[in-house]
Amino acid sequence: MSVALAGSPATNSAQYEPLRVMIVDDSVVIRGLISRWVEAEPDMVVAASLRTGLDAVNQLERVKPDVAVLDIEMPELDGISALPQLLAKKRDLVVIMASTLTRRNAEISFKALSLGAADYIPKPETTREPQAADIFKHDLLQKIRSLGGRVRRRAVPGVAAPAIAREPHPAPLPHPAVATPTVASQAALVKRSFGPTAPRVLLIGSSTGGPQALMSMVADIGPVIDRFPVLITQHMPPTFTTILAEHLARASRRPAHEGIEGEAIKPGNIYLAPGGKHMRVAKQGGNPVIALDDGPPVNFCKPAVDPLFMSAIEVWQGGILAVVLTGMGSDGMRGGKDIVAAGGSVIAQDEASSVVWGMPGAVANAGVCAAVLPLNQIGPKVVRLFAGDRS
């Protein structure tokens, strides 16, 4: 058994004590990489580096981690089997599932989310390719910091989570930091009136926590899907988006699939941006079609929300209703501003119901939202807006 432990935190720990990260992976290379990355961050420390899920379950109460990076495929006890045991022992443990990009692992990751995992991250096929390793590092550290900080903020009411949006180290692509409003300041956010034009298309952007939020929302908007097209960008890699589309189809009981280049956009369908490509909208013969873009990441994301939002204006002008759900970063803010400038409207998920209030917080803080609502109120509000309500 390969086990490395850090000292347990003091009972009278400071408010901004570094996040304690438990790394659980049977690959010594992956454990070593993640350990070095975490230890290089001033606001994190490696609480334990473990080889199996059984090690994690047995050591959990001793090492007291805030965040666990949990591999799926391990000997003795795999990640999906260890997950419920870990959460039974420590309900507020933030678990980030890590897996390679296979359909089986993607399906297991979705199951893990339903069992209480906070998020997932795809591991690169090889750590020898610098860009892949850099992206994995950037995404993992951001998830640890944002999700760990979110739990701490909930534990201390009225206290903003430390350093959620800051980027202390250079990233391979720019990813602007965004100040995250607290719940207390949310009531003071400036809200606009809904646009004068009745919406003709629904656009949705989401990231961390998005799969669960999307499945909840699409189950509430059946009447809208029946009469109007719905286009979604969820930050997610290939294979994962294929499975997410299947889940959305089941949740909504309507057709849902990854967008296809040149495909006509029609009412009655949910179109999901495929992993690894931006989904834009274009006109062909005067009709809206899907346009896939294999260009560089936008806002450090591919697919990104902004390309969808901004391209849709060329087709529907002010007849757009955009919804920004839970997620890290600020993707969707620039596109949201452009939608409002064109006469459309934007709704953001509120902080209390978001896993991470980065993306929705960014659009809300930018003053472009007509409403900032709990997740369970967004679907019904969308139905009313498409039925003609402009209030």
From Swiss-Prot:
Domain CheB-type methylesterase: 196-383
Annotated localization: Cytoplasm
Keywords: Chemotaxis, Cytoplasm, Hydrolase, Phosphoprotein
Organism annotation: Rhodopseudomonas palustris (strain ATCC BAA-98 / CGA009)
Protein's name in the database: Protein-glutamate methylesterase/protein-glutamine glutaminase of group 2 operon
Catalytic residue list: 207, 235, 331
Pfam families: CheB_methylest, Response_reg
Other comments on record: R.palustris does not have a group 1 operon.
Job of this protein: Involved in chemotaxis. Part of a chemotaxis signal transduction system that modulates chemotaxis in response to various stimuli. Catalyzes the demethylation of specific methylglutamate residues introduced into the chemoreceptors (methyl-accepting chemotaxis proteins or MCP) by CheR. Also mediates the irreversible deamidation of specific glutamine residues to glutamic acid.
UniProt xrefs under PROSITE patterns: CHEB, RESPONSE_REGULATORY
Residue ranges of every copy of the Response regulatory domain listed in the record: 20-138
Upper lineage: Bacteria, Pseudomonadati, Pseudomonadota, Alphaproteobacteria, Hyphomicrobiales
Presence of the UniProt keyword Membrane in the record: no
GO-annotated biological processes: chemotaxis
Enzyme Commission number(s) from the entry: 3.1.1.61, 3.5.1.44
Keyword Hydrolase assigned: yes
Domain comment quoted from the record: Contains a C-terminal catalytic domain, and an N-terminal region which modulates catalytic activity.
Modification after translation: Phosphorylated by CheA. Phosphorylation of the N-terminal regulatory domain activates the methylesterase activity.
Modified residues (4-aspartylphosphate): 71
